[in-house]
């Protein structure tokens, strides 16, 4: 919409450059494979299994195949052709073992063929065959999960869409305790995806996973650090440098994950400088980031401890509480106090070498002098449980906890909520959990879901319980999903097929981030030029049409979960008629929702354009101008905004001139 000639030609030029680069890369890879295949054809005799191979037991053949693969793929002085020969020999060993009903061989072959491991071209037909053999041989939960996945996605003609079979396979896996199967069933029941909508079924499966995770991951202890500071989910690939489907203009750039990545990139730039020259606000953010951890920046409590200490010393340079640096800026004092609170929590709740109650108390006392809420909570917790030399003092503990609650501290809100729950003051407990949830306390999601499920302090609501259980499950299980592997496959190895499959697997479990990435990888309209061609009825192939339909479906699913970029993308799909008939009214609604929920400038821009030209709206240049005026506070929109307003003025004069001529 409103495409300039310059943008058109730049986009076209970049697309041609990318096409040439991909062609050369593909040609190089193809020549390498052809040369390797010629070498293999000339040495085919060495790949034929001997009588000795067949004399071995199936288990020995599997073991030898794995040793061959491990050895040749770890050696640096072996030629590529030799690796291919030995790889094929190993696969033949696995195939012979699978024919003798060895279930390990079936599993290895299924994964190799499906995910294209060891540089094998993925063969969906073979992978379906081996997964099917495996689940029939021993009822493997993993094989049943994969068969359910095949049937739920119409992944190929070898396993067409069959919701009934998908459900059967997942239920078989769920009965064996597979958390993936429970998550598949929960999400599909929740949104009526290829099965009847059922809040009761959804909550049943989500509750099973939540209870399991709460016991295994949190140890039924709300002070477990991985639950206090959950992992940041930075598994996004979509867009330039993972910035979101619209690059720098994406709503994703305002997310916690992107802000964490931005902090990490600043940190990497600062590493070349002496630590004394660092910006202390950045140091504080990096320390917090190390508490949570993320795919590209794992958690490290020791590093957090060092950085927080460094920040705290900017106000308390010595061990004495009264020894402070005069004329310290208030911003540094605030960071130093917050650092003390984090240090106290680390020493109090760590299960490793950082655990030290005396140090925790010392840090909390410092932070409390500057009204740090974590420090109030820590001192209150220790007094309530008698963890200091003064023994149990619940009155003092509650007084300090309430000070933290007044500052909306999520840990204190949870602590007080649990106390109210024990006292059977259910309504108060429910509202405290709700307040903690607004502060993104992961543990509170579990307790809120329990409240809705049991009708504790609020009316029963299976849909609300399902949604909160879902938030808890997805926060705790994120690192155990296939999204991390998906990002690695595409970032490290450039295997788009494998990455797509991994994202698709997580998408079927209900992760909105996986849904938008699966859609993006299948999206034929990543660039503006693609959408313009579609707008003017550009002829497309059957494959492109199938890709459009797939992308539309998964963008729609992510949009239904509240992903702003997906909502905006859906607006584009309705506007240009991609994967769905053109519907300007729905497009306008999507742009409006995207703007209202995130203040994304492009939404307002497109709404103004539609009003200016009367597309799906009554033509009204005055409304268009008013909408554009709202963008004036956005620095990134300054120049295009001035151009657009200038053009609107010209357009307005043109319309007035036409009216004048008609009057004559």
UniProtKB/Swiss-Prot annotation:
What are the annotated GO cellular component locations? endoplasmic reticulum membrane
Provide a GO biological process annotation: ERAD pathway
Gene3D superfamilies assigned: Tetratricopeptide repeat domain
Has the keyword Glycoprotein been applied to this entry? Answer: yes
**Which keywords belong to this entry?**
Glycoprotein, Repeat, Signal
> Which positions are glycosylated?
101, 138, 221, 300, 371, 454, 537
Q: Which residues form a coiled coil?
A: none
Q: What protein name does the entry list?
A: Uncharacterized Sel1-like repeat-containing protein C1B3.10c
Its taxonomic placement starts with: Eukaryota, Fungi, Dikarya, Ascomycota, Taphrinomycotina
